Structures are given as C-alpha cells and as structure tokens.
C-alpha cells in the first residue's frame, strides 16, 4: 500500500468484509486510479447514520488482485461524524482485500 494513503478510520463501517477502504486526497486518488488499475476511486458524500451504495465504475478483470463484485453494490454506513482530516475531500479509494 502506498504510504501516502491512510487507512480508513472508524467513522466508516464496511458492511462487506471482503472490501477494504482507504482514504486519500482527491488529487492523489485520481493519480492512483490512473496508475494502478487495482484501485477504484469514488467521490462520496457521507451523512451521519445514512447508508450509501458505491457502484463499481470500472473493473480490471485481467488482474488477479481484484475481486469481481458482480452486481452487488458496496454499502458503507457512517457510524460517527467524520472530520475533514478523516475524510479529506470526501474521496475514498476502494481496493480488493
């Protein structure tokens, strides 16, 4: 994992245990998404207590590192209010665990 990317803090509860979330700044996320096909970048807006589904915008089916999620959305739920430091620019990078 890129040392510039920080692991997600407990503000997020991941429903699917096979998915791992990391947070990064928007500029870094875009660069990672272009340079590493294993990373999926999603803009998200989190609201306390709400659930949101993140659809896969692209899949790299040739990579053995990437789990194929088929039609099941990735569901993330806020469990506490997050600061901008915890969720910089409200972007997350979703990678296969």
UniProtKB/Swiss-Prot annotation:
It holds the Pfam family bCoV_lipid_BD. Keywords: Host cytoplasm, Host cytoplasmic vesicle, Host membrane, Membrane. Signal peptide: none annotated. It comes from the Viruses. PROSITE patterns: SARS_9B. Residues 8-97 form the 9b domain. It is found in: Host cytoplasmic vesicle membrane; Host cytoplasm. The keyword Protein biosynthesis does not apply. The keyword DNA damage does not apply. It is a peripheral membrane protein. One of its GO terms (cellular component) is host cell cytoplasmic vesicle membrane. Belongs to the coronavirus group 2 protein 9b family. Homodimer. The gene encoding this protein is included within the N gene (alternative ORF). This is Protein 9b. It comes from Bat coronavirus Rp3/2004.
